[in-house]
Amino acid sequence: MTATETVAARAVPDWRGGFGRLWTAAVVSRFGDSLRTAALPLLAASLTDDPLLIASVTACGFLPWLLFGLLGGAVADRVDQRRAMWAVDLVRGALMAAFAVAVALGHATIALLLVLAFALTTLQTLFDNAATALLPALVPTEALAAANARLMTGQQFAGGLLAAPLVPALLLAGDAVPYVADAATYVLAALLIASLRTGAPERPPRPAGSTLRKEMTEGLATLRRDRPLRWLCTATTLCNIGMGALIATLVVHVTDGHQAGSAGNAAYAATLTAYAVGGVIGGFLARRVAERTGRIRAVALAGTVQTGCLVLMGAVPALAVSIAAMAVFGFMGTVWNVNQTTLMQERAPEGMLGRIAAAFRTLAVAGAPLGALLGGAAAAGWGPHTPALLAAALFALAVASLAPLIN
């Protein structure tokens, strides 16, 4: 094998090793999560007609990231990530099984939904940060981009294209069935992760007197000092504010001009499907885009094209335009996410990836609800197509913030 062939081989993750099991666990788990997240709002709406209470279920899914996101990253850097992940999935599986029993027996309440959403996301803060930190131990550095692309493509396909359409059929079989399926996927994912054969993580000894609080502060300080990571985190946060504005009002944008009912629902479903399909295709091509342009330029290119898509959606209020724009937007969204995550994994100092990932995720989650509020206010004040233009402005700022890295 020539040197060129060796490098090319190392740039592709080996399915036969631990990566294949991690990929399967991630895809299976996303499938179950998507069943639950599609079914929970329907259950909440059947329990109360108070929109504030229904929205509170979603809010409880965000809150733990703001409260415990950085803590989850610090813990992920301290522990054996593999063990933490399968233990968390077993606990989440047990919680979902208990919740499924409560639904089957007719004991579900809004209070129970709030507690469940908060508990699951609290556990997710540790799981997601540990998963990001574990991946570089399973694949060579040269294969990180391809591995991230395959993970995101599989998750997008399972969650966006497979799970959501199944929910109505599963609910016909019983109100508890989606939650039983979610519990089963957690257990299966835990078994797959537990079967990984990775050595104990090698970390430098912690200084005397080191605490989780000090380690969280150290992670933020490292992010602030690293110029590429700092600007990349800034750009990602701005984009997530824009995404919050777009997604929160997308149904109003798409159904504007349709009568309430099947026509509007079909238009909205077609738009979401186009976005998911674009995201899946983007996963297949994200690494190739980076190979041609460089990783940071791939991120900037993705943001630039997404800005154009948002301007088009806001300026041309036609359903066909929205569907096409969302397909391209989803494509470039995966290109951004794959290369942003890979850059973060490549640049984070050894033993600090969990904390760096936690800072990215915490700021991203904080941006989404802020964007949703801004998007709602824009739609109420200036019409249903204004949030897309607001999102375009935020994406343009994000791309501009990357200019120092490109130059």
Give the role of each language-model region.
Residues M1-N407:
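Alpha-helical transmembrane-bundle signature of multi-pass membrane transport and export proteins
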